Amino acid sequence: MALSLERKGEIIKTYQIHENDTGSPEVQIAILTERINYLNEHLKINSKDHHSRRGLLKMVGQRRSLLDYLKKKDFERYRSIVTRLGLRR
């Protein structure tokens, strides 16, 4: 199941840089993290769902790319988003 519009809106409001910001790396990383967490819970119950596992790995790779970009571009924003989301880096 995809993120509900309400939940996605909450995430965007929490992590946006300015009022109309929906595509900054911080927002994208936060949305991907929410989707990754949902899929992790799904896969704990449905361990044989290999199609979803592949999608999860793709999302993790996308988030990793966005984090690497942000780390290169602005290290302070990178540290901030990692801390706020509770990622292990």
Swiss-Prot record:
What gene makes this protein? Answer: rpsO
Which Gene3D superfamilies does the annotation name? 6.10.250.3130, S15/NS1, RNA-binding
The name of this protein is Small ribosomal subunit protein uS15
User: What does the sequence similarity comment in the record state about its family?
Assistant: Belongs to the universal ribosomal protein uS15 family.
Entry keyword Ribosomal protein? yes
Pfam families linked to this entry: Ribosomal_S15
Please tell me one Gene Ontology term that the record gives under cellular component. cytosolic small ribosomal subunit
Give the top-rank taxon of the lineage listed in the UniProt record for this protein.
Answer: Bacteria
Report TM segments.
none
Give UniProt keywords alphabetically. Ribonucleoprotein, Ribosomal protein, RNA-binding, rRNA-binding
Annotated GO molecular function terms are: rRNA binding; structural constituent of ribosome
Q: Which organism is it from?
A: Syntrophomonas wolfei subsp. wolfei (strain DSM 2245B / Goettingen)
Report any one BP term from Gene Ontology: translation
- Read off the PANTHER family from this record: RIBOSOMAL PROTEIN S15, BACTERIAL AND ORGANELLAR, SMALL RIBOSOMAL SUBUNIT PROTEIN US15M
- Per its database record, what is this protein's job? One of the primary rRNA binding proteins, it binds directly to 16S rRNA where it helps nucleate assembly of the platform of the 30S subunit by binding and bridging several RNA helices of the 16S rRNA.
Disulfide cysteine pairs (residue numbers): none
* UniProt-listed NCBIfam families: S15_bact
Q: Which residues form the signal peptide?
A: none
Subunit composition and interactions: Part of the 30S ribosomal subunit. Forms a bridge to the 50S subunit in the 70S ribosome, contacting the 23S rRNA.
